[in-house]
Amino acid sequence: MAYKTLSPAFVKPNSPILIKLAKAIPSAEITAKETKETISKMLKVALGEQMDIAKPILVGLAAPQIGISKRIILVDVKANGKGIVGDLRVYINPEIVEVSKETAEWYEGCFSTDRVCGVVERAHLNNY
C-alpha cells in the first residue's frame, strides 16, 4: 500500500526540535490556556491523521513532532497494531517509572521520519 507523504503539520525529519530535550511544564501551567491550546492542536493533528485511511495509524504523538518543545504526548492506549484505535490519552511531563523484563517486537514507523519504518523491540508493559 502506498501511503501519502508526511503531513505538513509535522516538522521535517532531523529537525533540531526532535533531538533536544523538550521543556517540562510547571504544575502551575498545566491548566493554563497555552497548555490547553497545545493539547487541542495535538488532538486535531492526531485525529486528522487517524481518520485518513490512506495513511498508517497514528498511535502516539509528541508535541515536538509538531514544532512545540513541551513534554506533552498523546498515546492511543487501544491501538493494537491491527487497526483498533480510538482512545487517545494526554500525558504531561511523562516519565517511565517501571518496565517489564519481557519484551515484544513490533513493526513501527514514526510520522517524524516520514517513510522510515522497522522492527522495534520494546518492553512488553510500561508503567507511567
Where do the PLM segments sit?
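Positively charged
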Residues: 1-128
